[in-house]
Amino acid sequence: MSGHSKWHNIKAKKSKMDAQRGKIFTKLTRELVIAAREGGPNPDTNLRLRVAIDKARAANMPKDNIDKAIAKGAGNLEGQEFVEALYEGYGPGGVAILVEVTTDNKNRTAADVRRIFSRHGGTLAESGAVSWQFERKGVIELNKEQVPSIDELTLELIDFGVDDVLEEDDSVTIYTQPDALSKVLDHLNEVGIEVSRAELEFIPKNYISVSEEEGRKILSMLEELDDNDDVQEVYTNADLPEVLTAEE
């Protein structure tokens, strides 16, 4: 899962910069609205909303903004109507790319995404063309200092639907089945382990190694996609070279 780690690490640094200038609040607001609309305003019974609230808090989004977004999603306040879409395509080197969007204008967003793919030498594909190369997983990150033994943690969580527990630099990443994410989060909370990040993501089944030149083109494409306000998440099966991670 090293490719996921590299792109995530780059994106995490970028997200901090986005948060500092308030850009990320637009994306967080849309996710809160959609989550509350689809599953109701109670995070105790709505995992997606629970995760969205945690992300908003981590980005220092004001509580009033969070509450208003949830109220809009629940229908208690008027607001823009958003729809979700998943775009699939290929980037430089033939790597697979998934783009999750939340938009108030699908035609505009589709044109924007297509333009970005084309500008970077990629192509959009039909629905299902590349999504089969990914699996939907719950992803939980912990500070490594909270985990004395990876083996013990793995044994402790195996009955909760955990697929894997990996040690990565100064963090520990737990991968779960989507419907197990909430149970694992509850258990970690009960035993006093603080979660740094928890999300539902598309994880590649296999990664594709790319050259440094291809990696730079792919990274430029991913970053431009991520900069679009309508784009919520971008996933790829590209195993980006270490040198690119060090430069960011």
UniProtKB/Swiss-Prot annotation:
Name of the protein this chain belongs to: Probable transcriptional regulatory protein COPRO5265_0905
GO BP terms in the entry: regulation of DNA-templated transcription
Transmembrane segments: none
PANTHER family, sorted: TRANSCRIPTIONAL REGULATORY PROTEIN YEBC-RELATED, TRANSLATIONAL ACTIVATOR OF CYTOCHROME C OXIDASE 1
Domain of life (superkingdom): Bacteria
A single GO molecular function term of this UniProt record: DNA binding
Keyword line: Cytoplasm, DNA-binding, Transcription, Transcription regulation
Organism from which the protein derives: Coprothermobacter proteolyticus (strain ATCC 35245 / DSM 5265 / OCM 4 / BT)
SUPFAM superfamilies to which the protein is assigned, alphabetical: YebC-like (SSF75625)
Top-level taxonomy: Bacteria, Pseudomonadati, Coprothermobacterota, Coprothermobacteria, Coprothermobacterales
